């Protein structure tokens, strides 16, 4: 590996590569979330029978992981490059390894290991069979075959590839701190994100208004339930994302006891499951329009009616 790609160049190369494999290039979803999986472009589109191939960068906020910009590898906000392919291609692992070649990483010259790490997101009712991908001893990617999303069985099989962009870039650029990464020519990662890391950490751990957050969680939950009842799936899901982020802020602040924590997660999970069912019902009502094979589409609609 000779070329030390900037983080911007890494993103562009991944976009070009996965676009060539048939993925639509989506944009980051504009509501706070803890992982790219929580974007509606993955969470909602992974369920139901319609095909879906997409790739996008997703800034992911995890308040409890903030370290005031002082830790070289732990961040309040990191960036994921998310790929979802449904149905999963038989050669998805080969496609992934070829994507590393596009970044100048020859799998034959490096120690690349798929380490079993089955994935679960209890708060969203999600689980799958998966692996961490380790490159010369550093985890750079999470690879998952979804089994359950929003409490619903995933069929057809859907694969998710999630690159940790900061880790991947740290390896490619051979730096020990994410803040030393080159984002673009002459601009360091720290020039953009170090101060926000400090400020968000200070807010999350010291300054957030707990009473306000507790009130907001209840209000967001009420609004989500109301819009589920109204059949407005996407606005309802936005409020579930808001509940999730609000809970993460409360958790980082130490405002939630162990017993209360389980209760909050259960409340989020129940809403996510309701939305998953409502989304599939909405797509069925529209006739599963992304299924282009008419015979298959009619069979899928008949199967849904028989359930």
From Swiss-Prot:
SUPFAM superfamilies: Class II aaRS and biotin synthetases. InterPro entries: aa-tRNA-synth_II/BPL/LPL (IPR045864), Gly-tRNA-synth_heterodimer (IPR006194), Gly-tRNA_ligase_asu (IPR002310). Disulfide bonds: none annotated. It is found in: Cytoplasm. The keyword Zinc does not apply. Keywords: Aminoacyl-tRNA synthetase, ATP-binding, Cytoplasm, Ligase, Nucleotide-binding, Protein biosynthesis. PROSITE patterns: AA_TRNA_LIGASE_II_GLYAB (PS50861). HAMAP family: Gly_tRNA_synth_alpha (MF_00254). Belongs to the class-II aminoacyl-tRNA synthetase family. This is Glycine--tRNA ligase alpha subunit.
